[in-house]
UniProtKB/Swiss-Prot annotation:
MF terms in GO: NADH dehydrogenase (ubiquinone) activity; quinone binding
Primary localization class, coarse: plastid
Membrane topology per record: Peripheral membrane protein
Protein name per its UniProtKB record: NAD(P)H-quinone oxidoreductase subunit J, chloroplastic
The keyword NADP belongs to this UniProt entry's keyword annotation: yes
Family annotation (Pfam families): Complex1_30kDa (PF00329)
InterPro entries in UniProt: NADH_DH_suC (IPR010218), NADH_quin_OxRdtase_su_C/D-like (IPR037232), NADH_UbQ_OxRdtase_30kDa_su (IPR001268), NADH_UbQ_OxRdtase_CS (IPR020396)
GO BP, one annotated term: photosynthesis, light reaction
Annotated organism of origin: Agrostis stolonifera (Creeping bentgrass)
EC annotation from Swiss-Prot or TrEMBL: 7.1.1.-
Catalyses which reaction(s): a plastoquinone + NADH + (n+1) H(+)(in) = a plastoquinol + NAD(+) + n H(+)(out); a plastoquinone + NADPH + (n+1) H(+)(in) = a plastoquinol + NADP(+) + n H(+)(out)
Keywords assigned by UniProt, alphabetized: Chloroplast, Membrane, NAD, NADP, Plastid, Plastoquinone, Quinone, Thylakoid, Translocase, Transport
Function: NDH shuttles electrons from NAD(P)H:plastoquinone, via FMN and iron-sulfur (Fe-S) centers, to quinones in the photosynthetic chain and possibly in a chloroplast respiratory chain. The immediate electron acceptor for the enzyme in this species is believed to be plastoquinone. Couples the redox reaction to proton translocation, and thus conserves the redox energy in a proton gradient.
Lineage of producing organism: Eukaryota, Viridiplantae, Streptophyta, Embryophyta, Tracheophyta
Oligomeric and partner information: NDH is composed of at least 16 different subunits, 5 of which are encoded in the nucleus.
Length: 159
């Protein structure tokens, strides 16, 4: 499989990862271990990936793992087609912990909180990791494939 510059750099420096290929726009997707994510994130920022375009999370399969996905862009003055890379960090449902990248890209704030709220991934060292969409009293993670929808409906008075 063809590898991009980042994958080649990680191989050269003996950082365990897996290339997941390229999308239709030629953007490489890499799978990174959760324990390596904070140091790789710093490397990417130093290299010039100064913009976290988006972060999301999803449940891979019932009984399977959870994934946190980061789309990073290297924005430079005078460049019409900036470099991009996609990073996927997979964790098991029984201990879904990933280092937060809030301290590198501040735009990760609400995005990591939403991933925590909907999928249940805890982002270590996030300064305000709490629910952002659901009430604090909500039980469970609504976007997990094994989530059971509560069987209750609040009756509202029309007056």
């Amino acid at each position: 499989m063809q590898q991009g510059w980042l994958s080649n750099w990680l191989v050269k420096h003996e950082v365990v990862h897996r290339s997941l290929g390229f999308d239709h726009r030629g953007i490489e997707t890499l799978q990174i271990k959760a324990g390596d994510w904070d140091s790789i994130a710093v490397i990417l920022y130093v290299y010039g990936y100064n913009y976290l375009r988006s972060q999301c999370a999803y449940d891979v399969a019932p009984g399977g793992s959870l994934a946190s996905v980061y789309h990073l862009t290297r924005i430079q003055y005078g460049i019409d087609n900036p470099e991009e890379v996609c990073i996927k960090v997979f964790v098991q449902k029984d201990n879904p912990r990933i280092p937060s990248v809030f301290w590198i890209w501040r735009s990760a704030d609400f995005q990591e909180r939403e991933s925590y709220d909907m999928v249940g991934i805890s982002y270590d060292n996030h300064p305000r990791l709490k629910r952002i969409l659901m009430p604090e009293s909500w039980i469970g993670w609504p976007l997990r494939k094994d989530y059971i929808t509560p069987n209750f409906y609040e009756i509202q008075d029309a007056h």
